[in-house]
Amino acid sequence: MAKPTTIKIRLNSTAGTGHFYVTKKNARTMTEKMTVNKYDPVVRKHVEYKEGKIK
């Protein structure tokens, strides 16, 4: 069986609220760390989310 190309990652809020999203990314084409602007419901604003490991 072949190794899967997509991996699950955790997007952690940079606002320090502890909120996170779980998403997938293609590890072969996106080798750098992912940063996305998404909505944080704790602070009720759009903030930057940075990639972290799923524990």
Curated annotation (Swiss-Prot):
GO CC term (a single one): cytosolic large ribosomal subunit
Family: Belongs to the bacterial ribosomal protein bL33 family.
Family matches, as SUPFAM superfamilies: Zn-binding ribosomal proteins
Molecular function GO labels: structural constituent of ribosome
Gene3D superfamilies: Ribosomal protein L33
Name used for this protein in its record: Large ribosomal subunit protein bL33
Keyword match Ribonucleoprotein: yes
GO biological process terms, semicolon-separated: translation
Pfam families linked to this entry: Ribosomal_L33
Keywords: Ribonucleoprotein, Ribosomal protein
InterPro entries linked: Ribosomal_bL33, Ribosomal_bL33_CS, Ribosomal_bL33_sf, Ribosomal_zn-bd
Keyword Ribosomal protein: yes
